[in-house]
Curated annotation (Swiss-Prot):
Pfam families in UniProt: MIP
Gene that this sequence comes from: AQP8
Induction (record text): Transcript abundance is low but expression is slightly up-regulated in the inactive stage (during anhydrobiois).
Domain comment as written in the entry: Aquaporins contain two tandem repeats each containing three membrane-spanning domains and a pore-forming loop with the signature motif Asn-Pro-Ala (NPA).
Superkingdom to which the source organism belongs: Eukaryota
Glycan attachment sites: N166, N314
Listed name of the protein: Aquaporin-8
Compositional bias of kind Polar residues: 302-327
Keyword vocabulary terms for this entry: Cell membrane, Glycoprotein, Membrane, Repeat, Stress response, Transmembrane, Transmembrane helix, Transport
Amino acid sequence: MSTAESRNHYKEVPTIEHYSEAIGITNRKKMDWRGWLRKSTLVRSQLIRGCMAEFLAVFVLMVFIEGSAATAIFTNRRQDILFGSISSGLGVAMAVYVAGGVSGAFLNPAVALAFAVLGKLSWKNCIFYMISQYLAAFVASCTMFAYLYEALNNFDGGERQMFGPNGTAHIWSTYPQPFLSPHTAFADQVFCTAILLIVVLAMCDSKNWKPHNGFLPIAIGLLIITISCTLSYNAGAAMNPSRDLAPRFFSYLAGYGTEPFGVKGYTWFFVPVLGSHCGAIIGGAIYQLFIGGQWPDDTSDTNSVSSMSYNEDNSTLTKRKQVSNIVHDSKGAKGSSTAPVN
């Protein structure tokens, strides 16, 4: 056989790919535009995915908060605390649903800081999440200003005012009551955020009565409604620095001048930021001192009887654990294929 004939012979020898294609078996899948788009936009960095989730969730949160505040002002419902509280609480719940499965949905720089201090969140993630949250709040404020632009002009005649009958500053940020002193305002922000963290940590504690993940956003939303209904009279209960500071910067750019920062002689604008961070750390420390750090070492199994018997004395606890072990052993024996048959 010549060299040329040998080459043609080997070219015509069927390969395994030929047989696979002949019987319809192939590992090559045709990628449609959806698969191509997903592959092209897939982010493999867990940190970046978390930042993206925080950004989108805070954006959604701010749309609901600022939208509800604008609706209250435009419809003369400024004093309707329940309306604003329910809107804010449900907005938080929806935002937690958006990012809960990706980043944990911190939504709040103060909450992220408290979790980092307690060792529940890495400092790297904390810093980048905080940046994402501030950016999202600013972008959401820009978006809502464009969305509400004609309504704002219809309401105030195109002249941006802070307070009074045509004042719209409360759409963007929180402001204290005229009678509130600076030190009381600071204590107010610390107290509100501390309460927030105590309950949030309780809800996220697997050794406590943690709600199911699917219900957790609703529970957190109910918490926000409760705090807003009870602790918002003094200064609006911001509890979230990104929700307050970023829109305040935007309102400065949107025609309100320096007044958003000049309230109370420039002693207010930093209070919701500093007070919220301090309150979050204090609230986290209080929960760890009273609850989180007091769990016995043998309560890792949250479904066991012993974890539900935390307040019992040691002897009773031991007896209940023995009963629990006997029950588990008997169930295991019945379900085992090697168990003796009587």
